[in-house]
């Protein structure tokens, strides 16, 4: 089993260098949102983008952890005892939905899965089926097109939000004029695009 590189620390160092060289305020603010236990720069970037608040250019999807161990009940062994397997998704997001139910979304990124062979496809199906046995749990597999095209990336974030049972964010406030809401939503879009451009798009793995 591969061990996590200290890419949380590496991401902090990269962001710190940006700060010293006059890098963007978004990169500086991101320092406090970097998560440890990442296997790759892409995982670190996705965690930042999905987890940071809207005002900082993130999607504010919920509490983000990197490569957590998740126990899943498998078939019983020959003695009739319950058997468990452990899976480690790249990213786990946990959030309370509008109905008060806490849901979890697991995300796995595979830079090569866009050109996946039969073995990779079967592996992804097995992984989804394993997670499907868990209550209030959804699994997403992301490939390069979903993360390197911002429109697809934004749609993925919307699907994750819905899987978590959360309301649309941003949503129109009570008494807010439609024009004001559209302006606020557009401003958030530009912030999300800018952060994605800095922490997700440059990564290939």
Q: Where do the PLM segments sit?
A:
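Surface segments flanking catalytic/ligand-binding clefts of nucleic-acid enzymes
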Residues: 2-205
């Amino acid at each position: 089993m591969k061990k996590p590189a200290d890419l949380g620390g590496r991401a902090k160092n990269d962001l710190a260098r940006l700060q010293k060289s006059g890098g963007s305020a978004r990169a500086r603010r991101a320092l406090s949102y970097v998560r440890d236990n990442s296997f790759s720069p892409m995982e670190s970037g996705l965690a930042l983008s999905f987890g940071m608040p809207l005002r900082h250019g993130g999607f504010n999807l919920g509490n983000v952890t990197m490569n957590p161990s998740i126990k899943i009940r498998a078939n019983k062994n020959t003695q009739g005892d319950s058997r468990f397997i452990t899976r480690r998704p790249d990213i786990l997001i946990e959030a309370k939905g509008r109905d008060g139910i806490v849901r979890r979304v697991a995300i796995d990124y595979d830079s090569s899965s866009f050109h996946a062979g039969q073995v990779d496809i079967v592996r992804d199906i097995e992984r989804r089926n394993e997670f499907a046995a868990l209550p209030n749990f959804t699994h997403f597999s992301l490939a390069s097109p979903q993360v390197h095209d911002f429109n697809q990336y934004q749609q993925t974030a919307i699907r994750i939000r819905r899987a978590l049972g959360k309301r649309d964010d941003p949503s129109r406030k009570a008494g807010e004029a439609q024009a004001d809401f559209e302006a606020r939503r557009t401003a958030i879009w530009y912030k999300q695009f800018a952060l994605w451009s800095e922490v997700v798009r440059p990564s290939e793995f």
